[in-house]
Regions:
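His/Asp/Glu-rich mid-to-C-terminal helical/loop segments that flank catalytic regions of hydrolases
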Residues: 94-125
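Generic structural signal for well-ordered, non-membrane alpha-helical segments
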Residues: 18-26, 50, 66, 70, ...
Length: 125
């Protein structure tokens, strides 16, 4: 940004726009649910429902998904040296909006909860 002379989407303490999560946690999640795939997640300050805006975010950051929470979670975890992973279920695609979000919300929450519960259960081993 103009204030800190870094490109849009990058925090000055990071070498690029990508915020790292804890690889071992992400790898474990994919072992639990092999259908999970790594994606580039754009994290912004507002919900984007407009398909044209979603396409712009995709083109600007090569993002597969966009949402509002990931950057805050990863930044806080990294700053406090706490392991972090993100399991995101796409609940509204580029063409979808609030209606699609409501239809898939419960299924997405159940899958995410299952992954987290299994990882936490395995931590004591």
């Amino acid at each position: 940004s103009a204030a800190d002379h870094t490109e849009v989407g990058r925090y000055s303490q990071y070498p690029d726009i990508f915020l790292p999560t804890t690889k071992v946690l992400s790898d474990t999640a994919r072992k639990i649910h092999p259908e999970l795939v790594p994606v580039v997640c754009a994290s912004g300050d507002k919900f984007i429902a407009d398909p044209e805006q979603k396409i712009k975010v995709h083109e600007m950051f090569d993002a597969d998904i966009c949402e509002m929470e990931a950057a805050g979670i990863v930044l806080t975890s990294n700053r406090n040296q706490v392991p972090c992973m993100l399991v995101k279920c796409v609940s509204d695609g580029i063409e979808g909006g609030f209606e699609e979000f409501q239809e898939t919300m419960d299924t997405a929450a159940d899958l995410c909860l299952e992954v987290v519960e299994k990882i936490v259960a395995g931590m004591g081993r």
